[in-house]
Amino acid sequence: MPDMLAAACKSNQTNTEYDLVDLGGDDLSKVVSLVGTDGFMKLDKSKIPNSSRVKAESANAAEFCQPYRGTTVVLAYNSQNVTEVPTTAEELYQWIKDHPGRFAYNVPGTGGAGDSFVRTTVYNCIDDQEAMTSDDPKWMDQWDEGFAKLVELHPYMYKSGGSIVYPNKNQGALDLLSQGEIDMCPMWADMLLSQRAAGTVPAYIKMATIQPSFTGSVQSMLIPNFGSNPDGA
């Protein structure tokens, strides 16, 4: 979706089918990085019923989007195989080492759950908690320890055909967990709950939170200025 929206904006398309779009934090950040806020209409919140009751705020393009729900990344696990669930990041890292090949996270660029694992691991290695929510580039100088931790964990990740494999997209990791290929992975809470309710994920796949917690995201609605029915949106 971000690439399609950016392409429509850059090519000056009009009267498209993108009247109202629903974007998570990662997708919104990507669109803004590609085209800025030029492709969206600034919202008049007075025309949006109950918007004042929504406490969540988007870190990007706040004047152009209406948050409507937040979600978080949790630790999804196979309760048939995992009897002692990690409760802290350090316990999780040790679990990964103690159970080689039984943990996976998706390629960060393909889904927010994997991105959250990487981002949280990096910032867990920075003592100042402000770093997690700051966009100040000064924190980049302190990323090395976190990336070293990810390199340290790499040999213990899921393997296929004898090689380390990072699944594609959030769904790829959840499929591995559901199929018994792994016992644990980071996953969006709403994605896990909805698929478990639909019966596509076994009931014994459960979730837990750890401390410090994984990063989350806010879902927001935006109105592209190249849609066909902005008034209706």
Predicted features and spans:
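Extracytoplasmic ligand-binding site segments that recognize negatively charged/polar headgroups
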Residues: 2, 17-19, 24-172
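Short, well-structured alpha-helical segments in soluble
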Residues: 4-15
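Extracellular/periplasmic catalytic domains that process cell-envelope and extracellular macromolecules
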Residues: 13-16, 60, 66-69, 96-98, ...
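A residue-level structural signature of the nucleotidyltransferase/glycosyltransferase Rossmann-like core
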Residues: 19, 74, 183-184, 213
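Oxyanion-binding "anion nests"
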Residues: 169-196
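Extracytoplasmic/periplasmic substrate-recognition and gating elements
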Residues: 187, 191, 198-233
